[in-house]
Amino acid sequence: MRESPARIILRVALLWVVTWVLIPATASADQLTVYPARRIITMDPSLPTATAVAVRDDRIVAVGTMETLQPWLEAFDYEIDETFRDKVLLPGFIDPHLHPDLAVSLLARNEIITPEDWDLPSGFIEGVTDRAGYLARLQELVDRDPDSDKAFFTWGYNAFWHGLITRQDLDAISATRPIVVTQRSSHEVVLNTAALEAAQISEEAAARVSDGVDWEAGRFWERGQSVVQGGIRRYLRDPDSGSDGLALVADLIHRGGVTTISTAGSAPRPGSATWTAFDAERIPFRTLIVPRPGGFNRRPGATLSEKFENDKATNTGRMIYTKGIKFMLDGAMFAQYMQMGPPGYIDG
């Protein structure tokens, strides 16, 4: 059924009124930047595609075509930026589970040997997808400085590609230099004999942990990592390594097209290194923070709702505490350590 001309005019008039109402009254002093594009994929079912977007103070204020943006252009000063005239634009990605501090530890303080490729500012690292290739790459990296007495750290090992790596494999790489291998999920570490000795980790201490430890294989996972974490940090790690790691992580987030991340369980506080780095003016993404629930009730009478309000009061435009909490109930997904009921993992 075709609409009458009067009905069409009324609908267009209403659209213009709504558009004007939505324009903030405080915007008059701010210039718009309009970006025409070959195509804009909005991911909004009511307007799936567009060809122009208007931005003010780093925020999108309108999306549509140059014609539908006319109310804005007539009301405010603007400039046309042709940078994306022949490009296709789409919203930024969301990474719902990223720990910046952990990313610093893994990417900036380890040699990377993973199944997937990594394209870092420092260079391209080709992935390794079999056991022989992994051990060969590890030997090559350790041999670059064979006389060093500094501990060698590597991250990215995954048994589903590289087979089970044990203390004996690492002893064959070097019987004198401490080697610490961190699994791809970071929920497991493997140490050679030299590393166990240098970190002052004893078999007696390992025996006091009921699960997550294979002493003979030098493997420590999930709860078992508590046996070795203190010794690694105290005796093996260089405290100054990875000092610029947050800048690297921020760069990788940006390069990946991610505009929102969520860190669950590890909650940076105002004034911390992570908060300061990720709340800087140059950072083009937001960080949503989902803290653990523990600790809020250490003060008598404290409530979880009070904690939420106190956290929310610290929010900025980039660092945002949510009303969610993270419970630590299970094992790592990447390492397939989740405690699954029957039939367990059905995809291998």
Label the model's feature ranges.
Residues R2-E3, L22, V34:
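Selective for proline/serine-rich intrinsically disordered segments
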Residues R2-L14:
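Bacterial N-terminal signal peptides that target proteins for export
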Residues R11-P24:
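Bacterial N-terminal signal peptides
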Residues A27-A29:
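Boundary at the C-terminal end of the N-terminal hydrophobic targeting segment
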Residues Q31-A37, I41, P45-E306, T314, ...:
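Divalent metal-binding segments
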